Amino acid sequence: GLGEFTDSIHTLFGTSMHEVLQTYLTVMYNDTIKMADALPLEKMLLHRMKENYTNIMKNNGGEVFCEQEDMEEFYNHGLLILEWFKKKRGMYFSKKGYELVGIEVPINYDLPNKIKFIGYIDVIIYDSVRDRYKIIDIKTSTMGWNKYAKADKNKTDQLLLYKQFYGAQHDIPMDKIDIEYFIVKRKLYEKVDF
């Protein structure tokens, strides 16, 4: 059966980190890398965490779902992630031959029996050299994904559905769409590479 969704510091942090990274990528692809690098990412993360906390509290009737020390711990982990991201960004996201198709790209696909598939794709990038699309799902994780998480069909099937329905919605052949997770670890360890 389906469980009831409850907000937590993990969802608040994940949403906030998504918003900051997506803003960075939007500026990077639509303007310049230099402008993206000049963004005050640390302040943006703090602002998004506070905003998302306030919104969750409004929506849940004021029920406290995380403590101040959790917010501080996650924010400090976020600072390390942003530092890592700025250093390693070029390994994962390049402007040379790539264009940003969209951020939070909506999918609204009609299925049989009056069922709709509705979702949002975190990032879509077009490779103009190879004429290919890349659907990227940003995941925040406490310690990264082990082989079991990588093999979890619930996780991988989501991206396969995005690929299927995005391709169908935009008349793009499936063999021209790649899917990829961009996993950012909340807990970083010395001498451990991503």
Describe each PLM feature range.
Residues 1-11:
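C-terminal, charged and often intrinsically disordered regions of DNA end-processing helicases
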Residues 9, 13, 17, 74, ...:
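Hydrophobic (often cysteine-bearing) scaffold residues that line and stabilize catalytic clefts
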